[in-house]
Structure formats: structure tokens, C-alpha cells
Amino acid sequence: MSKGQIFHSTFSEYTDPYTGTVVKRLTDPSILSHHMYFYNRMTTSDGQYLLICQKRDEGRQLYTLNLHNGEIRQITEGDGVGQDSAMFSHDDKTIFYQQNNRFYAMDAQTLETHCFYETPEGWSGSAPGMSSDNRFMSIVETRQDTLPPRDGSAGWNFFCAYLPG
């Protein structure tokens, strides 16, 4: 699958049996999907688009989901996409995201992309956060030699490396 490819999602609704609340499912439950990190601006100002991550045939990629018609457009390709790192700019024209140790700005219409920052060698960059006026971005940089292996061998102990004491 490649950047710009279009998929379709069929929305469905059901009533939660415990609360009586109507729940609207936006994505196919057979495809692993999730939204961006909670403080990232993941919807456009007009509420038409939502940034999501999905795991399809070739791993996890970022997509825009049109909340009016269910169209899903793939916006990244390749390995190392920061699966919860994307955010819309304050004017909805740019999508910022992380891939490997690089941070990118992408034109939301044309998908033209340019790298604006790369973490130094020996460091890992993550958790980008943008100011509301898009003037400042914070990035967590951690020395790679202080991180546990990310190959799954540590299991849940991977997270213990970040606990105090």
C-alpha cells in the first residue's frame, strides 16, 4: 500500500447495553485502528477529518478519516511511523508527524513532505507536542543506550524501565 491510497470505512451504530448511549463505530473492527495521542490536535477545525493509525498489510501507517463519508486516505509509508505522533496544524493545512528519528511537515492536500528536524545520532525522539500557534514543538529525546530493547523480548518489563526507583 502506498501514500495516497484510498480505503472506505462503513460506520455503524449500536446502543451500549449498560448506559443506553448510542455508540458510533468509525472503523472496521477487523483492522487495528487507534487515534493520536490525547494532546495532539487530531481533528480539523470543521470536524471533517480525523487522524488515525491503522495496521494493514504492511504495518502501521497514518491515515486521514473523512468523518462525513468514511473515506480513509493513507498519508505515510515505510517503517518507523510514530503511530500516535501526528497532529494537524492550527489552520488544518499541515500535518506534523514522526517517522524513525525524523520529524516531518506534510501538506494535508498534496501530501508533499519535508523533514524539519532529525534527532542527533545515539538519541531517540518521541512524543512531539505542538503549541496552539504552531510556533513551538516539544520533542522528548532519550539516549538510546538507556532504552530497553524494542524487539518485544522485554515484554511488559519494557515499561518498568520508566518507573521511578
Description of each model-found segment:
Residues 27-54:
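Short, contiguous, helix-prone interaction/anchoring segments in small proteins
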Residues 19-21, 36, 153-156:
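Short, solvent-exposed coil/turn segments
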Residues 24-32, 71-77, 112-118:
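A short beta-strand motif characteristic of beta-propeller blades
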Residues 1-24:
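Blade/loop signatures of beta-propeller domains
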Residues 32-39, 59-103:
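Blade-loop segments of beta-propeller domains
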Residues 20, 58-59:
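Short acidic/glycine-enriched loop/turn segments that link adjacent beta-strands
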Residues 80-89, 93-165:
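Asp-box/WD-like beta-propeller blade repeats and closely related beta-sheet repeat scaffolds
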